[in-house]
A protein has these predicted regions:
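Bulky hydrophobic segments
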Residues: 1-145, 150, 164-180
């Protein structure tokens, strides 16, 4: 079993991010402060989501718990594919779980269509967000004590949809105001 601290994961993501941005800047021979700030928002979304998805929410000895990489004995115990089956009765605090899973992904629905031109419709933004959350859910199969749940996929994608609706409604309102 391998244990990873939040700081180690944060450092790894940061190094990958910086290297990627440098390579892209060198290849394109261009640098835009505005674009880098936009992409920094994407980075912040990823890091915050990694914090709450990969690491237990409660502290252990005043520290964020480590992420344990490995496999459970029976993978079937780690996967729920029945919508809303465990949502309410799995644990106390299920209301907070619903709110947190939705709220955590609202920024993705807001930031991604602003940063990525190809996400020019609500549908494309929601599909990209659903793909992102699916990757997160599948990745959790490699972590001890974590599980993959279709409820999380539904709730996270709902958060993306709410964020996307906010952005696209603002854009529609701006177009109407500019045409007056």
């Amino acid at each position: 079993m391998i244990e990873i601290t939040y700081f180690q994961l944060f450092l790894f993501i940061t190094i990958i991010w910086i290297i990627t941005r440098c390579i892209i800047a060198i290849r394109l021979k261009t640098f835009s402060v505005k674009r880098e700030i936009q992409l920094l928002l994407v980075y912040v979304c990823i890091v915050v989501i990694c914090r709450f998805v990969c690491f237990e929410f409660h502290l252990e000895n005043g520290k964020i718990q480590t992420l344990r990489v490995g496999f459970e004995d029976d993978i079937r115990d780690m996967i729920n594919i029945i919508p809303f089956y465990f949502l309410v009765d799995r644990y106390h605090g299920w209301q907070m779980n619903i709110i947190a899973n939705i709220a955590m992904f609202i920024p993705v629905g807001i930031v991604w269509p602003i940063c990525f031109r190809k996400l020019d419709t609500i549908k494309k933004t929601i599909l990209a967000g659903a793909g992102f959350t699916l990757i997160i859910e599948v990745t959790q199969l490699f972590f001890l004590g974590r599980h993959t749940d279709v409820d999380d996929l539904i709730l996270n994608t709902s958060g993306v949809a709410i964020g996307a609706c906010i952005v696209f409604l603002i854009r529609i309102k701006q177009k109407k105001n500019s045409s007056l």
